Amino acid sequence: MSKRRAVLGLKNERKRSGGMVFADLTDEDAFRMAYEVILRREPDAVGTADLLPRLKAGQLTRDQIVEFLISSEEFRGLRRASLLGPSLHMSRCDFIRSLPRARRVLDLGGTHQSNDDGALLGLGYPYKVDEVVIVDLPPDDRHPIYRAGGRLTEKRTAMGMVRYRYHSMTDLSGFEDESFDLVYSGQSIEHIGEDDADLVFDGVYRVLRPGGYLGLDTPNARVTRLQQAEFIDPDHKIEYTVAELSAKIERSGLRVKELKGLNYAGECLSDGKFSEGTVASSPGIYHEAADCYLIAYLCEKPHQGRSVQPSTSVIG
């Protein structure tokens, strides 16, 4: 959605109860409609407590509220998602379908905004499981753009039982040693700090059975740093290069078995300039991980026990 379309949407949007246009609505209804049309969600508590009183007091106009929302990082993310999002989604589905068969799976940060089966099954994991355990923050503790979904305790699906645990993925102490065949972390490690990431990888090592796998995909900082002012997600704490994340993973004792990239971005790196269209037009899984928009790992817990491996020799 462009800025122009967002504004036109507000001008043309009619309130379902009464057919009133935006200019005729009460301040409360106009405020809510601005969020629904521009950000595609209800107003959050912060906006309601800060912006709405100023609108009602005449300190802000409706046009200023609209401009504030259109200028937000969240709106820019929605605009990018309209083109790049579906392409990345396709590539991530390909990656998930390539993960090994497992009976018991731990999915870190795995709630799905619109599918209670969770991210792993929702994106096409092809094997039936005994159980998928999804660990994610309680909905009210997540960033506002991630509060949809993940409100169940369990769900029986055609692929197996899905159970939810609502707490930080940095604390896996509630799970027994060597109790999972596969751990999946899809677009979640970038939402926590570096020290917390070390806790996650140590926890993953402990709960994986010997020979078990960690599948992980995350933005590649070598590419996303070209974006700068239009940073992909307001909730990201840190994005890693291949070299940085490989070293962190291997310090936990896990071994990088396969390293791939999703959505080739080599042309952007050569030009030194990010192009959403270029990246969106190159979906798929690539061997040149350091030159892709997302990096995707398959890591293994060695049968012989913890042994720190030297970092993978890669660019980035």
Model feature map: region roles:
Residues 6-79:
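Substrate/cofactor-recognition hotspot
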Residues 76-100:
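Class I SAM-dependent methyltransferase Rossmann-like catalytic core
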Residues 110-172:
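Class I SAM-dependent methyltransferase SAM/SAH-binding core
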Residues 170-183:
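A short acidic, Gly/Pro-enriched loop at the edge of an enzyme's catalytic core
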Residues 198-213:
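A short glycine-rich, Lys/Arg-flanked "PGG" loop and its adjoining helix->strand segment in the class I
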Residues 216-236:
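Short, glycine-/aromatic-enriched active-site segment of Class I SAM-dependent methyltransferases
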Residues 237-253, 259:
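Short alpha-helix
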Residues 258-316:
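A C-terminal cap/extension of S-adenosyl-L-methionine-dependent methyltransferases
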